[in-house]
Amino acid sequence: MIKLFNSLTNKKEPFVPIEEGKVKMYCCGPTVYNYIHIGNARPPIVYDMVRRYLTYRGYDVTFVSNFTDVDDKIIRAANELGEEVAAVAERFIKAYYADTCALNVKEADLHPRVTETMDDIIAFIADLEKKGFAYEAGGDVYFRTRKFNGYGKLSGQALDDLQSGARIEVDERKEDPLDFVLWKAAKPNEISWSSPWGEGRPGWHIECSAMIKKSLGDTIDIHAGGKDLTFPHHENEIAQSEALTGKKLANYWMHNGFVNINNEKMSKSLGNFVLAHDIIQQYSPEVVRFFMLTAHYRTPINFSDELLKGAEAGLERLKNTVANLQHRLAETADMGAEEEWLEKIAGAKQRFIEEMDDDFNSANAISVLFDLAKEANIYMSEAQTSKKVLNAFLELFAEFGEVLGVSFTQQEEELLDAEIEALIEERNVARKERNFARADEIRDLLKEKNIVLEDTPQGVRWKRGS
Ligand SMILES: Nc1ncnc2c1ncn2[C@@H]1O[C@H](COP(=O)(O)OP(=O)(O)OP(=O)(O)O)[C@@H](O)[C@H]1O
Ligand SMILES: [Zn+2]
């Protein structure tokens, strides 16, 4: 049985879905105004692993993750670049897909966008207002936090501690400093939507509440996101949704730890970040993903060249074992002692499942993989081997690889479509910024990989050369 650490109760709990065999899962997605750094890539990678494992264990998973495609940061970026908000958002949504696809993150079943969910967001706020949980003030709408019983239950904070906390801004339009914004009145010349409270746009927290309700219903099984989202974002999502429906928003809350660099959280505001699309040029995307999964998702992971090189070497060892198994298979007849080895392989599978059942411990599951490789190497040193055993080893590597989203078979060094598109996008940006040196460098890199670019009036086209 799968157990997972529920941030709501601070305990590891057996996973019991609302509907047998089905999982409704939501993960807060990115605000699309720049490229993702490797810290931002951790939530998509680890929750993709969780989704894959739940699927492996027989659940039918519906996975939803949003795009925040209008917000202060995007508006600021658009103003700086002299572009439309929609153009900036579109570009970075493409870049997000390109990076996460290279990292072998499966697309969500649904990727709702704020700008496409506006009617539902407005209806959600209007219903909160009707119930007395929201009030209008000068074109803004706020949530009446103290009216919601249970505010603070996720982050474990009492209302009065929050009140004195420095993170709450004081704004005289609010009835109470704890109240937070649901709808923001538009500033002059700012992108806006019509609403019962005038022209404006939604606050950040309300989007997720409205999108979850629309796409998955009132109560979902798992709500996931980075640890920094616990407060205020997730606390506010709970308040909005539960005030409206009277039902629990999510039965299980999962929060991933940070990617640190020199023991400090990697973040855009600190400027200590490494972009995902840069690091996957230096190491393969597979190595980056494997590296990420060598730590348990809740523990902080330090980002360093040394650790990445370690992950690269480890992955190489596993791939070599698999290549040797394949090679051996081609020249083996069916003979040798089978039962003992088949039992060993079945035992490894059992241990892998036990580790993953225990709060998705991919770190320990990967050490089971290394043990499996060790066993495989011992087996191959025997004089006589059997096709059946070699196949059983290979099947298990393939099975684990599918769960982790990392392939252990050797591949030609070929660029994936998504990586090519990411590079072309980066070249477009470089050209726009008149950074022609970088633009040429990218053209050369693509040429080296036999990708031919063609500038057309409709934009850049590409094809693989012969
Ligand atoms: N270092 C990190 N490790 C793991 N997850 C992270 C890290 N930084 C951000 N995230 C996650 O990435 C997503 C986007 O976060 P956000 O845009 O706040 O990134 P950021 O770099 O921290 O930006 P800022 O410094 O502007 O807050 C969130 O889900 C957040 O939890
Ligand atoms: Zn959210």
Swiss-Prot record:
Gene3D superfamilies, per the entry: Cysteine-tRNA ligase, C-terminal anti-codon recognition domain, HUPs
Protein name: Cysteine--tRNA ligase
Disulfide bonds: none
Reaction catalyzed: tRNA(Cys) + L-cysteine + ATP = L-cysteinyl-tRNA(Cys) + AMP + diphosphate
High-level lineage: Bacteria, Bacillati, Bacillota, Bacilli, Bacillales
Main localisation: cytoplasm
Quaternary assembly: Monomer.
Any one Gene Ontology molecular-function term assigned to this protein's record: zinc ion binding
Free-text remark on how the cofactor is bound: Binds 1 zinc ion per subunit.
Keywords, in A-Z order: Aminoacyl-tRNA synthetase, ATP-binding, Cytoplasm, Ligase, Metal-binding, Nucleotide-binding, Phosphoprotein, Protein biosynthesis, Zinc
One Pfam family named in its UniProt record: tRNA-synt_1e
Subcellular location as annotated: Cytoplasm
Protein family according to the UniProt entry: Belongs to the class-I aminoacyl-tRNA synthetase family.
Recorded GO CC terms: cytosol
Cofactor field: Zn(2+)
Coiled-coil region: none
UniProt gene name: cysS
Short motif ('KMSKS' region): ranges: 265-269
Chain residues that bind Zn(2+): 28, 208, 233, 237
Motif ('HIGH' region): 30-40
Enzyme class: ligase
Enzyme Commission number, as recorded: 6.1.1.16
Annotated residues for binding of ATP: 268
Alphabetical GO biological process terms: cysteinyl-tRNA aminoacylation
Positions where Phosphoserine occurs in the chain: 269
